[in-house]
Amino acid sequence: MNKTSNNKLIYSVLMLVCVVGFWLFENFYTPNTYSQQTENGPTTSVASNLMPSSTTGDIVEHSHYMLSYNEPFEQAEWVAYTLKKEHLTNDDRKRPYFIEDPKVRTKSADWRNYKGSGYDRGHLCPAGDRRFTEQAYNETFYTSNISPQDREFNAGIWNELEMQVRIWAKQHGELFVVTAGVLEEGLNEIGQEDVDVPRYYYKIVARGNGDDLKILAFLMEGKQSSKPLKQFVVSVHEVEKRTGIDFFQKISKQQQDQLEAKVDTGSWKFKF
């Protein structure tokens, strides 16, 4: 064997080792959980009096958000979290791998269902809202916290809504947020586990408490739009009708009827 042939063989073997090594790392050397770390940082307890109902009973509580998992659709029917002004930091975090949620009884969908599907792994509790500690950031990479989203939608109007919520958190100090895709029959599916692709997504934002409680709900089709965010505002009743979820079940019936039926954009300043 001449020198040129020998070099080609060595190069080919090295390439094969690299490819196999990357595959093994990607498939077998990811962590089992992101919830074992203990770090000092801002508190993120979710306001119990604002928690929505669960149509499945499969409620999971993480350190920095809660969710209700819907196994037939292989994603959360809602993710709820508190967003405070002090949560919004510019800490540089290393992006971790997406992993299955160890707290979901039936196991959340594997991230590989999204591979080659053409859809983004769209965060529900945004990673950008949880940069204040490594644990908080990493917890957003459980697959129970993602939903298939069109890439232009995820990077466009949905991202604008997330940025608008951050602006409100800075203005008002603290918000309660609940969000997910609308899970309904007849949706397209991706991957071996048949992860459903929602046609619509909702986000409900609340601030204050008692008689000072202010609520704003958004419902938008999962495709890019140049419309201002105000055009996607709906009543909470509309989102409840579409999802079957009772979003503010623990406040008085009188206050529910009053707040959930109206659309109050006047109490919120819009940038987008």
Model-predicted segments: where are they?
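Domain-level detector for secreted/extracellular nuclease and nuclease-toxin modules, and
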Residues: 2-272
